[in-house]
Amino acid sequence: MAGRVGIVAVSQTKFEARKSTQHVAEMMYDVTRDVMGQTGLTFEEGTGIDCTTAAGYDLFSGPAGAYMFLGYVVGAYQRQDERVIEDGALAVYYGAMQILAGHVDVVLLVAYDKESQVPKNQIEWVCMDQVYQRRVGLDFVSAAALQAMRYTSKCGITPEQLAKVVVKCRKNAANNPNAVCCDSVTVEDVLRSPMLCDPIRVQEAKPVPVDGACAIIIASEERAKKLTNKPVWITGLGCCYDHHELGWRDLADCDALATAAQRAYKMAGIRDPMKGFDVAEISEQYAYQELLWSEGLGLCAKGEGGKLIDSGKTQMGGELPINPSGGMLSGLPVCVAGMQRVVEAALQLRGEAGPRQVAGAKRALAHGVDGPAGQLQCVVTLEN
């Protein structure tokens, strides 16, 4: 197996509710041109990028075969081309594994989504089991509501604690020029917002739609050291998925995430996650998920996500700031979010996060999720 895998360049668009003047291909072009410009890399045989890996759903982005635009816009012909029809964190996982296995040295990763093109809930409904779940109109939002109901009732999570998550994320987003929702809110504002799907309120959910893209170039240790003087090393990777049928799992637990985290931590040599990281970027489409995912990641004991947000430890300046970028609650496309978590973590470790910088950050945790009620989980650990 090869040595370490390093992140040598990252880029992201500004995320907007509707990029009406940009095609998916143009968003891909902007971020790939940026990362290739940062490194000076081309697709030259033997000295350039060996492989491209794109993450996204055609059904969410509009045009069929949207990933094929990547070849058009960057000239990636006659190279290995892979596609991940999942959250962008899976593209990072897959790309890094290709390098660790010794198959390639340099990989261009791109995640894209244009949620404004399609009615998202109808697409998610089609993704559900056609025999039982689709017949009752279940989509990802209603699946999340079932999980929120189960989790909050079992673990005693209060509406005020959920609202605190939103308040924190919006406050952090004010320092992120790429975020969609930057307006400050209070606990009372969140609790007064309309019900989206009981018990989830509108302001407790990520805004829909959101359009945008991001890109990363990763490389083997030898190549990474030549391409940048500030590589960010991927130290651990873990992935796990749970049963698609909601009734086959306890929605108040996140066993798939716990397993993915354990795999990543073992690879990275992390024994105490709360003390092992300086910053965490978690994919939370709903407020309750930041608390539940924190439990699965081992940042607090099971059932104590509410106590964690009450403690202030996850605020900027706290023991482990979670989502200094504002997270998904401040506006990210579903397919892009996991890779963008890695982008944000890399910026933190390079000291390039601007007003949202966590001082002295040396180790970071990034997390991606996909599927109904967090069916698929991916964890990436990084250090500078």
Predicted regions and their residues:
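A short, glycine-/small-residue-rich helix N-cap motif at loop->alpha-helix starts
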Residues: D87-G88
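Paired acidic/hydrophobic, glycine-rich loop segments that form the ligand-binding mouth/hinge
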Residues: V106-L108
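A basic- and aromatic-enriched beta-loop-alpha substructure that forms the phosphate/nucleotide-
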Residues: V84
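C-terminal membrane-solvent junction of multi-pass transporters and transport-like membrane proteins
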Residues: G331-C335
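Short helix-loop capping/hinge motifs at secondary-structure junctions, enriched
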Residues: R223-L227
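Active-site histidine-anchored catalytic micro-motif
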Residues: A91
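Ligand-binding pocket segment of bilobal, Venus flytrap-like solute-binding proteins
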Residues: G212-I216, S220-E221
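Conserved "HGTGT" condensation-loop signature of ketosynthase/thiolase-family condensing enzymes
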Residues: M1-Q80, M97-A101, A111-P207, C214-A215, ...
